[in-house]
Amino acid sequence: MSTPTMAAPGAPVVDLDLAELRRDPYPAYAALRRTAPVAWVPSVGRHLLTRYEDIAHAEKTPEVFSSREQGSLLLRTVGPNLLREDGPQHRRLRTAAEPPTRPRQVRDLWAGAFEKNAHDLLERIAGRGEADLIADFAEPLAAVNLALVLGLRNATADDVADWSRAMMTANGNYADDPDVWLRAERATRAIEEAVAEIAEAVRTEPDGSVISSMVHADIALSEIQNNVKVVIGGGVNEPRDVFGVGARALLHRPDVRDRVLGEPALWKRVFEETARWVSPIGMYPRQLLKDHEIGGVTLPAGSRVALVIASGNRDESVFERADTFDIDRPHRAHLAFGGGPHFCMGAWVARHEVSALAWPLVFGRLKNLRHDGSAADRMEGWVFRGLTSLHVTWQAA
């Protein structure tokens, strides 16, 4: 199957600056939804799908919009993996890896340790009266919890966080920066060594982890290693970034914060609205297996497309006042965790970690918590998006 390297007939060509997208992609996405919902973007080398309806359709038709994109950045970074498989091969890997991340397993196996990890991290900073909640809390919490669920007891939280940054930067390396590939290669080797050691240990002593589950489903070591790399990538940035974006929103909306503190059931709404408002994963690549018309454009077989989740989640035809953070908006399923057979495997882990533990603990424990407006906190990214830091102050005991 050949891969077209130019716009499909009838598709508008739109030049987008990647640096500007990293800074703030939403104005460009709004313009695309209005005037060019299926557009060829030369700087990305693919057609961008930016409307909710088209993205949802593509996610539900893997027989047309295949995850098995030839030469994808993810394949280059980690090798063959379940995110780039469809059909029986995807089901085989997902069935082996998913059980430890299901809601019941999260509650029964991991919730107690997650809570202890959150308390331990908060205890380290509680007496300081100031912190960067990303570097000092959200990222190490996501990393230590991920190591637990994966079974990587031979890796520290710092190891997992460093590996995740290397994987995610490479997965979004559309600029083809050689230094990015070098860091990813180093992380890849380290992950493979750690996984091989644990896989051997759990063969005789199962521990309920993802690696253990895959070993006892007779998945080959190389496949386990590749899929652990994938999970390490998304398993840190998604809970970290949802935590940071939602925390900052609440710090600037004390009325909402006070409501949620008084009615803890609302934390779930805060999570879903945060994931919609600033999606931690902004796009998914796909490749067409056959000619297909979508958004008024017939895309030929082989075409590479981007399902721009971050844009679909701001589609005004679906979400009224879509650019506004609003936990009271009428329920409509967002796209932040994907859909169809590729629905995010770690969604329930992230939901519990952030909405049941991290936010309630931070906002309940740190009195008079305020955003430090003098700090240079910024939001960045378009393939993946989140806060680089979140500096806060509070009244230390």
PLM region spans:
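Cytochrome P450
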Residues: 1-397
